[in-house]
Regions:
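Conserved "HGTGT" condensation-loop signature of ketosynthase/thiolase-family condensing enzymes
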Residues: 1-106
């Protein structure tokens, strides 16, 4: 069995747009669950969710790319960018690179 080493972490969720703010909110016992604001929920029985509301995809992609790329991919790109910075990657070596991702929907 080969060893696996986690060298960088990137997070984006309803509690924070990066790992530091996410961990801080978790340690403070906060929840990201609140009333849904990103779309009309009047026809749905559930009115709450853990939405990511403060993320601006234009901070990582240009206008054309934002329109072409689904939101869950935008979020993945943001988290991946943070993980690569956290790992102090200088150059990309694809054969040494792996990604573990978790999402509620997407």
């Amino acid at each position: 069995m080969k060893r696996v080493v986690v060298t960088g972490i990137g997070m984006i969720n309803a509690l924070g747009l990066d790992k530091e703010s996410s961990f801080k909110a978790i340690c403070e016992g906060k929840t990201g669950v609140k009333e849904i604001t990103s779309f009309d929920v009047s026809d749905f029985p559930v009115k709450i969710a853990a939405e990511i509301t403060d993320f601006d995809p234009n901070s990582i992609l240009d206008g054309k790319e934002v329109k072409k790329v689904d939101r869950f991919i935008q979020l993945g790109i943001q988290a991946s960018n943070e993980a690569m910075v956290d790992a102090n990657f200088k150059e990309f070596e694809a054969h040494k690179f792996g990604v573990s991702s978790a999402a509620g929907i997407g």
